[in-house]
């Protein structure tokens, strides 16, 4: 899901837009694989992040890349970096 390094670079992740009903904000669903502590099986986990979309360009179903940023509101700590793939209508 995330790539961390000691240089302080911003983390970027790719996910799917699940909501664009808010003004200049999108909800992005992120999938990641996590190894179960006891059994060792890899399990798919999901997280939902709110991201800032200044131009309201992302739509539901789009695959987007979001970048970590300073806190913009109570729940918004990500910003839209680019739309990787548009939704098929």
Curated annotation (Swiss-Prot):
Which UniProt key words apply to this protein? Ribonucleoprotein, Ribosomal protein, RNA-binding, rRNA-binding
Molecular function GO terms recorded: rRNA binding; structural constituent of ribosome
**Where in the chain are disulfide-linked cysteines found?**
none
**What are the BP-aspect GO terms?**
translation
Any Pfam family matching the protein: Ribosomal_S17
Q: Which InterPro entries match?
A: NA-bd_OB-fold (IPR012340), Ribosomal_uS17 (IPR000266), Ribosomal_uS17_bact/chlr (IPR019984), Ribosomal_uS17_CS (IPR019979)
Q: Name one GO cellular component term.
A: cytosolic small ribosomal subunit
What does this protein's UniProt record list under function? One of the primary rRNA binding proteins, it binds specifically to the 5'-end of 16S ribosomal RNA.
Q: Which family does it belong to?
A: Belongs to the universal ribosomal protein uS17 family.
Record note on quaternary structure: Part of the 30S ribosomal subunit.
This chain belongs to which protein, by name?
Small ribosomal subunit protein uS17
């Amino acid at each position: 899901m995330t790539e961390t390094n000691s240089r302080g670079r911003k983390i970027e992740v790719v996910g799917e837009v699940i909501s664009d009903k808010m003004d200049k904000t999108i909800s992005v669903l992120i999938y990641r694989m996590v190894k179960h502590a006891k059994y060792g099986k890899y399990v798919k986990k999901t997280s939902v992040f709110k991201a800032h979309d200044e131009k309201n360009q992302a739509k539901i179903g789009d695959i987007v890349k979001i970048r970590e940023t300073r806190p913009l509101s109570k729940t918004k700590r990500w910003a839209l970096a680019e739309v990787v793939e548009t939704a098929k209508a």
